[in-house]
Amino acid sequence: MSLNQKKKACIFPGTFEVFHDGHLNILKRALKLFDFVYIVVAINNTKTSSDLEKRYQKVEEKIDSLSIKNVEVIKWDSKISDFAKIKTIYFIIRGIRDVNDFKFEKYIADIYKQEWDKLEVVYFFSEKKLENISSRKIINLNKGKNDYEN
């Protein structure tokens, strides 16, 4: 019997340019609802992403350093819905910080449903103290840019 038949699992997909406290918060909250979480470090063709292998390694190191159980970090270069089908996972978790995120996430959820109608997206709203954190802001700060530069 596979893990997914015994336990309720979900997918936490993202490019994870920086796996930050907002992501970690969503992961910990998801583990309260799900028995197992696959963090899927993915490619987003609409974003400029750093090397998939490097991003995967950074996320895996972070999870290992925190000794978080019932999580597996995966690198994936295809559709998230394909990963879900292969693993027979019906839930994807996503975070929402604001109205702009909501619009984008609704669009993405519709795509997931078109690709595989068994998928459901479970949303976690950012905690107030974390809603201004984003990978892009962290990258820009590290480069000495303000929040609005790309």
From Swiss-Prot:
Transmembrane segments: none
Recorded metabolic or biological pathway in which this protein acts: Cofactor biosynthesis; coenzyme A biosynthesis; CoA from (R)-pantothenate: step 4/5
Binding site for substrate: 15, 80, 94
Gene Ontology CC entries for this record: cytoplasm
Single Gene Ontology BP annotation: coenzyme A biosynthetic process
Reaction equation(s) it catalyzes: (R)-4'-phosphopantetheine + ATP + H(+) = 3'-dephospho-CoA + diphosphate
UniProt keyword terms in alphabetical order: ATP-binding, Coenzyme A biosynthesis, Cytoplasm, Magnesium, Nucleotide-binding, Nucleotidyltransferase, Transferase
EC number: 2.7.7.3
Enzyme class (EC, first level): transferase
Principal location: cytoplasm
Function field: Reversibly transfers an adenylyl group from ATP to 4'-phosphopantetheine, yielding dephospho-CoA (dPCoA) and pyrophosphate.
Family indicated by similarity: Belongs to the bacterial CoaD family.
Subunit-structure text: Homohexamer.
Protein name from the UniProt record: Phosphopantetheine adenylyltransferase
Organism per entry: Malacoplasma penetrans (strain HF-2)
Organism lineage: Bacteria, Bacillati, Mycoplasmatota, Mycoplasmoidales, Mycoplasmoidaceae
